A protein has these predicted regions:
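Alpha-helical scaffold domains
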Residues: 1-161
Length: 161
């Protein structure tokens, strides 16, 4: 566990996009827990969003729990702010279907964050039937716990439970 976290920290210090992606690809099979997965947010990736998006879409199609979780985490960290955001990313994440707890929780976390940053676009996904019910309810719960979601928005979200 500690060795993998150290390896992840070294990857995060990478200053070159190509070498960072290469090291990340080699490291993916060793990610076996949520903590190691969620710490991986190399800053260099934020300067190469179009290229990174291709990788993210590949990773979203993976059968591996933590590769899918990493892809959603990258979408949450790098693509929900106004400069990089596009509505289609919400649809991509909503389409992720998994029985894996750590994937479902990341989808919920993504949508809770989307409700804080892109409320109007994320809100329709909180309607019943737009995603797996358990995940939808978790997303609402996490949004209600967030300090970044306004009291008015929280009041409406409560009515959707």
């Amino acid at each position: 566990y500690e060795e993998n976290n150290l390896h992840g920290l070294i990857i995060m210090e990478s200053k070159d996009y190509g070498s960072c992606i290469g090291e990340l690809e080699r490291f993916l099979p060793y990610i076996d827990n949520w903590a190691t997965c969620d710490m991986l947010r190399p800053k260099i990736l934020s300067k190469h969003l179009p290229e990174l998006l291709e990788k993210i879409y590949q990773w979203l199609a993976s059968e591996d729990t933590y590769i899918v979780r990493l892809a959603i985490g990258f979408l949450m960290s790098f693509y929900l702010d106004d400069g990089a955001y596009q509505r289609e990313y919400l649809a991509k994440v909503a389409e992720v279907s998994s029985k894996e707890y750590y994937v479902r929780m990341m989808v919920a976390w993504y949508f809770a964050t989307a409700l804080a940053k892109q409320y109007q676009d994320a809100l329709p996904y909180m309607q019943k039937g737009r995603m797996e019910e358990w995940t939808r309810r978790k997303a609402i719960q996490k949004a209600l716990e967030s300090r970044r979601v306004s009291p008015e928005h929280k009041e409406y979200l409560r009515s959707l439970r």
